[in-house]
């Protein structure tokens, strides 16, 4: 209920174009913009930026 409104599940897709995704929760109050995190992409075996997908 309220949990899903404040902290929705978001998909983080790799900017390397591999199609690899992470799924996480984000706090809309603290991060109203699209989330960008630098995480490991096991397909290309490198750290790359992952952007929030809507």
Swiss-Prot record:
GO molecular function: structural constituent of ribosome
Signal peptide: none
GO annotation, cellular component aspect: cytosolic large ribosomal subunit
Protein name, UniProt field: Large ribosomal subunit protein bL33A
Alphabetical GO biological process terms: translation
Family: Belongs to the bacterial ribosomal protein bL33 family.
Keywords carried by this UniProt record: Ribonucleoprotein, Ribosomal protein
PANTHER family reported in the protein's UniProt record: 54S RIBOSOMAL PROTEIN L39, MITOCHONDRIAL (PTHR15238), LARGE RIBOSOMAL SUBUNIT PROTEIN BL33M (PTHR15238:SF1)
Gene name per UniProt: rpmG1
